[in-house]
Every structure is written in structure tokens, then in C-alpha cells.
Swiss-Prot record:
SUPFAM superfamilies: Phosphoenolpyruvate/pyruvate domain (SSF51621). It is found in: Cytoplasm. Catalyzes the reversible reaction in which hydroxymethyl group from 5,10-methylenetetrahydrofolate is transferred onto alpha-ketoisovalerate to form ketopantoate. It comes from the Bacteria. It comes from Kosmotoga olearia (strain ATCC BAA-1733 / DSM 21960 / TBF 19.5.1). This is 3-methyl-2-oxobutanoate hydroxymethyltransferase. 3-methyl-2-oxobutanoate binds at D41, S42, D80, K109.
Length: 267
């Protein structure tokens, strides 16, 4: 899938996107036929164990993006630009976005509306595709005072509508809508010619994205209403590890089938 196919999908078919942070995650996502992979700054929460996304660095994200590209060579990959990788200056933002493209990303994602529209236009003008992100923007968690549903007040709706318009004019190819009231997300989707990708934004967006660890039931401590679990891998993994631990301690593993005879490796 390429930029043109993503844009042309609007009104014709839904887009699927999932986060991934490693070679094998990406490989499985591509095998499943997922349209787009987002190497999210949620890498900080899900892989590195940070409380939120703010501590994630460019260097950490670059490693994840390059691993994902190797695992999914034929899937459209978007790199999340981490906190302070694009806010300090336009020059630094362009440099950092370019670094993601060099290691294999097809596009980058930035949070914000009016405050980043000018930067988005410059990135696009320099040949770097950009995905927008409105609604709940996790990098602003300290300003907004937590993870709150957006679009509940007239002021919030006005800001979202303005953001969609400005991002579209700046040249984004798609916009993530996170934790937005369903009716407002529907209106935003209808107001723009670019696809919207929802996460906790209801049924009427042009596509959906979920975090790997949420949809596969790995992060069971986090159970927001908008997440649907398609597996219970945490239980399966813990059960397998318990079985391994038990078999090692009682001498059942390794068994005869797991050892080499005097001849060495099988030929």
C-alpha cells in the first residue's frame, strides 16, 4: 500500500493499522495483511516500561523503526516522532523526520493541529509524508491533566474542526483521531478529504488502529472501553513459562528428543 492508495481508500474500504516495535511483531502484522504499521511512541509504555510516552528518545525509536522495516518489507510503516524531536525547531524536526525515512519509515506522525500545521507543510514540501494526530495527544498529557475523551465541549469541537482543516491544507495523507466522541469523529471524518484513523473514536472513521499489547491481551492491566481483545496471550505466555519452569525443575526437560547423541548435530 502507498500514499495514493491510502488516500483513495476513503469512502471505499476501511483501513487497518496496528502498532509494532520489533522484527517479529512486524513480520506477523505483514503476514496478517494489516494495511499500515505504526511504530508508536507507545514503545515507551509497552516495551521500555515507562509511565508514559514522554521519555522515549529518537535513538530508541530509530532502532524500533529499522527492526519493523526489516520484519515487514512490504507494509506501509509510519514512525511516531517522539516528544521534543519536532518541537524545538523546524530545522531539528526536519532532520529527525529525515532520519526516520532513512531507516525505512514511509512516513512520520506528529501530534497537534494549528501549532504544527506550518511544520507539516514544510515536511511535505521536503518530500516527507506526514500523518496527523488530533483528539487526545499523549505527549500533552501533563497539560491536559490525564487521558480524557475529547470533543465534549464547543471549544474542544471547534479546535478539532480547525485542526482537521489546517492539517489537510498542510498536506497530511491521513489523521489519527484518538479518544474523540463518536459523533464528533464522524463529523470530522465527513469534513476532510483525507482518511481518518480512529482509536477510541467510534465506528465512523475511515480506519482503526490499536496497540499491539492491548488487542492481543498482553497488557491486561489496561482495559479501556474502546479496546477489543482478540487474544489472551498474556495467559498463554505465562502458562507456557510456568510449564517450562516446572519441567526444568522436575527434570522432564530436556527429554531424549532434545539432546544430541555422540555423533553431534544431525546431518
Amino acid at each position: 500500500m502507498n500514499i495514493r492508495q491510502i488516500i483513495n481508500s476513503k469512502g471505499k474500504r476501511k483501513l487497518s493499522m496496528v502498532t509494532a516495535y520489533s522484527y517479529f511483531q512486524a513480520k506477523m502484522a505483514e503476514e496478517a495483511g494489516i494495511d499500515m504499521i505504526l511504530v508508536g511512541d507507545s514503545y515507551g509504555n509497552t516495551i521500555l516500561g515507562y509511565e508514559n510516552t514522554l521519555p522515549v528518545t529518537m535513538e530508541e525509536m530509530l532502532i524500533a523503526v529499522s527492526a519493523v522495516r526489516r520484519g515487514a518489507p512490504n507494509t506501509f510503516v509510519i514512525a511516531d516522532m517522539p516528544f521534543l524531536s519536532y518541537q524545538v525547531s523546524e530545522e531539528k524536526a526536519i532532520e529527525n523526520a529525515g532520519r526516520f525515512i532513512k531507516v525505512g519509515a514511509n512516513a512520520v506522525k506528529l501530534e497537534g493541529g494549528a501549532e504544527v500545521a506550518g511544520l507539516v507543510k514544510k515536511l511535505v514540501d521536503f518530500g516527507i509524508p506526514v500523518m496527523g494526530h488530533l483528539g487526545l495527544t499523549p505527549q500533552h498529557v501533563n497539560v491536559i491533566g490525564g487521558y480524557r475523551v475529547q470533543g465534549k465541549t464547543d471549544k474542544s469541537v471547534k479546535r478539532l474542526l480547525e485542526g482537521v482543516k489546517l492539517l489537510e491544507e498542510a498536506g497530511v495523507f491521513a489523521i489519527v483521531l484518538e479518544l474523540v466522541v463518536e459523533g464528533i469523529a464522524k463529523k470530522l471524518t465527513e469534513e476532510t478529504s483525507v482518511p481518518t484513523i480512529g482509536i477510541g473514536a467510534g465506528r465512523y472513521c475511515d480506519g482503526q488502529v490499536l496497540v499491539w499489547h492491548d488487542l492481543l491481551g498482553i497488557n491486561t492491566e489496561f482495559s479501556p472501553r474502546f479496546v477489543k481483545r482478540y487474544a489472551n496471550l498474556r495467559k498463554d505466555i505465562v502458562d507456557a513459562l510456568k510449564k517450562y519452569n516446572e519441567e526444568v525443575k522436575n527434570g522432564e526437560f530436556p527429554g531424549p528428543e532434545n539432546v544430541f547423541e555422540s555423533g553431534g548435530f544431525d546431518e
